[in-house]
Amino acid sequence: MREDAFQIIQKTIADCLPDKAVRDSLQKLDFTGKVYVVAIGKAAWVMAKTASVFLADRLEKGIIITKYEHSRGALDKFEIIEAGHPTPDENSVLGAGKAVELVKEATQEDTVLLLLSGGGSSLVELPMPGLTLADIQEVTRQLLFCGAGITEINVLRKKLSAMKGVKAVIFKSPCA
């Protein structure tokens, strides 16, 4: 019985790994035109690597935006940006801008694949007009200091950022 429980736990964990989740999901999709990949989060590199292998020659280019020291090295056709987590930094803004640029390259015939994992709300940042990165950093620091959870932090991030929630449509490409 103990061995059965251990095997069930191992299988459950294996099924939740980002590479398996991405591979299983990609097998269900049809891709048209060139494929552009935007991978954001602490598991972004692993997800992008899996997508790269799966897509092979269909992959046009991509961007990986991940936490510092979470990249495992260069990936062909991908630009890698490491950024601040849990507090966004200048690279979070840089990554957001580069993601917008990449998505805008796609045409109506192309596919844009967005791969998101935990940490993404900090790793890409585009302050709403009238706000600065410093404003968002200060709000984040204060929320972390007072013990706010990620749910509370993300509620405010959606109000302060042009990259969160439905406001992300501002960078929709012609293929959207």
What does each of the following model-derived ranges do?
Residues 1-163:
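N-terminal loops that bind phosphate or other acidic moieties
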Residues 158, 166-176:
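Phosphate/diphosphate-binding loops
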